[in-house]
């Protein structure tokens, strides 16, 4: 998934910058479809898929798609800017971060409701299984709490209303977010 995302980000860098709003809309529609897909799955519906669609939905639902975008965004911070590939990838760091957040929301939604629907079984657990479930849920909720302000302030319209210093200090919370994602993985 990560190699595919890097290739897309590199080869379509100019288009991502130029058509970012349209890409956000398409990404949001796909994410909404994934959330609806999750609702059907959690309610026990059997779904017939077109070839490749099941894997695509699974990539979004599992968090792999959003995670791949976040990995790229995270590593862009250490790219050496003297290389053309680094400059080309980094020119859309904010846009790719927004896309990552949009693709992560279905994953968050699925596992939040799966946890709630499965809470009767989780309370019966003890030891490591209970601790693991509670830790994963807590880390996820904490990560979402950090991700949402970062997501909102990544939009140029919002970012322009903030001072550079305030925006940069808020963006430092991204490192905590990455740590929470690491805990979950």
Q: Where in this protein do the model-derived segments appear?
A:
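Membrane-embedded alpha-helical bundles that constitute the cytochrome b-like, heme-associated redox core
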Residues: 1-185
